[in-house]
Amino acid sequence: MRYIKIEDLLVFRSRWGQGNELWKNSVLKKDFRDFFHNKCWYTEVPLVGQDVHIDHFRPKAAVKPFENFKYNHLIQDEGYYWLANDPSNYRACCIYANRKTGGGGKGNYFPLADDGVYQSEKDENNEHPMLLDPCVAEDVKLLSFLGNRVVPATDDELGKERVRVSASIYNLTDAYISNERGKIWASIEQLLAEYASGDISKSSCIRQLRDAISPKAPFSACAIACVNSLAPDEIKSELDLIL
């Protein structure tokens, strides 16, 4: 998961019209898809050969309980309806993350931490979501990878639990997605081994790593985690490893 500054996308709000089902607007869907280089905002799965799904981060029509977590049961039958046409609540994603498939999928789940109060139309900022939000820089920093596995990048117990819940709901542990991340990790591990043995130059190694960690690359957050874990300091110092 990479940080996505949605404010830079919302400057195009006037292009999307005023429809009652704004998330279906074709221009909006293209803008959201293109903004993160044709990738899912949650999983970094390339959106090649599949439609982009516009997810409502806070569900628009209903809210379902997840495990034993608190949730906004006061609006369980109508959801966060007042945010249905608010593009700041939209996240572009793939079918793996958005729909209930396999063991995960976001659907209408929106679990909350025990602290905080329920959000209402008049009071929007007091809920504490368990789901990590790619549009919140501090959330993105909590999640990392080790090989094809999702791991927390924090010792905080609540942070660890948020990573676990997000990995499950966003389907980050799906077999296909995990396998593709594993390929990225293995390729970088091999590249660094070739650099260490002198088979490739430092400049060649850095050039290939820059491609792998680029926001345009699939699963680039996993690539960054691999570089942080395995690369020597003289390589890391030449790279932008900010999520």
List where the protein language model places each region:
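A boundary/linker detector
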Residues: 1-26, 46-48, 237-243
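Histidine-centered nuclease catalytic patch
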Residues: 45-92, 100-118
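Short Cys/His-rich Zn2+-coordinating modules
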Residues: 17-29, 71-79
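Short cysteine-rich loop/turn motifs with clustered Cys
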Residues: 28-53, 94-97
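Long, low-complexity, intrinsically disordered segments enriched in glycines and aromatic residues
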Residues: 108-160, 168-172, 177
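Short Gly/Pro-enriched turn/cap motifs at secondary-structure boundaries
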Residues: 31, 81-82, 132-133
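C-terminal, charged low-complexity interaction regions
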Residues: 151-243
